[in-house]
Amino acid sequence: MKSYPSDTWCTYPFTALVLHNGGSYGPCCSANEAVAMGTDDKEVVLEMYNPNQKTEFKPYAMSAYQAFNSKFMKDIRQQMMEGKRHTACSSCWRQEDLGIKSKRQGMNQVYIEPGVGHADGGFEYDIDEMVKNPRLRSLDLKFDNKCNLHCLMCTSGSSDMWVPLDNKMHKYLALQNVTKEDDLDLYMDDAHKWQWTPGEFPETLYEEIKRLVPQLQEIQC
């Protein structure tokens, strides 16, 4: 078993971003906080599932490069190096406190220990290199929330099939029905993996992705 920098360390903030279909960025799709460009052109942090969220921001105004190097992401990386629990990752902390294997723990294995429970796939990155030189290697794009599934761990922000369920459970879940945005400002510094969520997409998607990110090695669907 590999030795991690701390008990709260996660590969995602050091290697990945998710671009939400509302135009903000997070370290992963499970994070409950995101970063975006405010209306005053300054970085703002958003609470993803707070129905009383009042912070105004400009969707897609921040590039992936800016997001990955934002104060928000740097704070997450720093707190994890210090063994602290960042509030953006509360979903994983709750699962781990209950004795459930969290996404953080599972993805650490995928990225660092692909031979542990992952016979197919995996990356086996070098931890020291990731810590010393965080680089954007994986960008998870959500083009819209059109989907024919309503997976238990998902939300209406990623699947419109959840909207009717949210309406029934509005006292417990934040309503999120996000419309499609076509103009994406994308920049990946050292990318090799691009993951998209089921939804509408242009017929020339793959050609456009390769044009935007020529160093891409893998497109995962």
Predicted regions and their residues:
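Short boundary motifs at domain starts and secondary-structure transition points
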Residues: E124-N133, K210-L212
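Accessory C-terminal segments flanking Radical SAM cores
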Residues: M1-G117, R135
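Radical SAM/AdoMet-radical enzyme domain recognition
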Residues: E203-C221
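Canonical Radical SAM [4Fe-4S] cluster-binding loop centered on the CxxxCxxC motif
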Residues: P27-N32, N133, L141-W194
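A detector of helix-start/N-cap boundary segments at the beginnings of structured domains
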Residues: P5-T8, S138-K142, Q195-W196
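N-terminal pre-triad scaffold of radical SAM enzymes
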Residues: F14-G22, D128-G157, I219-Q220
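Short microdomains enriched in Cys/His and/or Lys/Arg
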Residues: Y49, Q109-I127, K168-E203
